[in-house]
Amino acid sequence: MIVYLFPTEMEAKAFRRLCPDAEVIISGVGMVATAAAIASLDRRKHLVASDMVVLAGIAGAYGEGVAVGDVVEVVSERCVDLPERFRQSYLQRVFHTKLRRVASNTIHAMGVEAEGAEIENMEGAALFAMSEVIGFRAVEVRAISNRVGESFDKWHLDEATAALAEALKRINDGE
């Protein structure tokens, strides 16, 4: 079983058009909403090791290493909003796509430093944490919509969500 988890309907819309039969869940934005959505999914479906939950959405890029419109697989996440001694990192040991692999920060506050990450998002660490607890396969796919710190009116949402949908279709088709 593959379930596609999106923080918002806006991020899911183009994928729903390309893959209308795919199982899509809108989790809500942030780590708490994502963890709750996965817990609810597990309660209903009893996730097992062969099940895959694909968290997909937009992300911001630090610096110039990843271009706006690029689609990447996140292979490590750090919770950087917490005080240093409580920060948790998650590392993906099995890769599920042919996409470029990047490190990410999961954040909820402005002004967080990259510290080795190439992108940032608001949900990824929750996916990896829940995967460790429950035991399903976790895949995080992000399309770059903006540079970190850019004002929202400069984000390339249509371009990013279209690229995301195409990449997810390839995953859904087994490519």
Feature roles, as predicted:
Residues 1-3:
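Extreme N-terminal starter segment of soluble prokaryotic enzymes
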Residues 6-175:
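Glycine-rich phosphate- or other oxyanion-binding loops that anchor nucleotides, phosphorylated ligands
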